[in-house]
From Swiss-Prot:
Entry-linked CDD domains: RPS2 (cd01425)
HAMAP family, per the entry: Ribosomal_uS2_B
Descriptive protein name: Small ribosomal subunit protein uS2
Organism: Sinorhizobium medicae (strain WSM419)
SUPFAM superfamilies linked to this entry: Ribosomal protein S2
Length: 255
């Protein structure tokens, strides 16, 4: 395995270079702006390329050392893409709504995850002795918890790295990451504050094709990290008769 390749052409075709209207910009983004066209800022892809490459390396290194990556994107055009990318790369995600304290109050979140697991057990049992109405209420509670916490139910603790689409919308997630010292990889559009981000990627954070490209590359970088971690163990885990227990799952079961 190797880090995923990408080209300037791919970035252009996905519309990564299109920022927002010039009057909506954040002046801190000036170093990453190439110019403007029809009152829309054009992001300097000559800077995006190396910064995206650096972000991919960080993701791969984090996973290779046994770390967990949390994908965060709750806006409509990112929600499904974020979840798919995280699942494909055996990572974790928040794609519905960021609950305040999701990282900084992990104990409370863990209790809610335990409740979600309990509801799964209860509803899987046919002989649970509930009325139709009681069962319906339990199903609704499970659905609500699963929508909020389904993507982190097996995370087993706070992540080692966060990848974020739309830093303005996910400002609370970024604040919590900062408080806990969790590094953040994020796409920064022309209306964002780059100072808040450890590994910024200048680019459009609204176009579905651009979001899909970032998520695909980050997911593939995480998969590269998994391959490196397995290679470092000196054996082919896929060929083993006994597959080792994933530490994150082990921690989650103990939580």
């Amino acid at each position: 395995m190797a880090l995923p390749d990408f080209t300037m052409r791919q970035l252009l075709e996905a519309g990564v270079h299109f920022g927002h209207q010039t009057h909506r910009w954040n002046p801190k983004m000036k170093p990453y702006i190439f110019g403007d066209r029809n009152n829309v800022h054009i992001i300097d892809l000559a800077q995006t390329v190396p910064m995206l490459s650096r972000a991919l390396q960080v993701v791969s290194d984090t996973v290779a050392s046994g770390g967990r990556v949390l994908f965060v994107g709750t806006k409509r055009q990112a929600s499904e893409i974020i979840a798919d990318a995280a699942k494909r790369s055996a990572q974790y995600y928040v794609n519905a709504r960021w609950l305040g304290g999701m990282m900084t109050n992990w104990k409370t979140i863990s209790n809610s995850i335990q409740r979600l697991r309990k509801l799964d057990e209860i509803l899987a049992s046919e002989a649970s002795g509930f009325t139709k109405k009681e069962r319906l209420n339990l199903e609704r509670e499970r659905e609500k918890l699963n929508r909020a916490l389904g993507g982190i139910r097996d995370m087993g603790g706070t992540p080692d790295l966060m990848f974020i689409i739309d830093t303005n919308k996910e400002s609370i997630a970024i604040e919590e990451a900062k408080r806990l010292g969790i590094p953040v990889v994020a796409v920064i559009d022309s209306n964002c504050d780059p100072d808040q981000i450890d590994y910024p990627i200048p680019g459009n954070d609204d176009a579905s094709r651009a979001v899909a490209l970032y998520c695909d590359l980050i997911a593939r970088a995480a998969i590269d990290g998994i391959a490196r971690q397995q290679g470092a163990s000196g054996r082919d885990l896929g060929a083993s008769e006994e597959v080792p227990v994933e530490p994150a799952l082990e921690e989650a079961s103990e939580a």
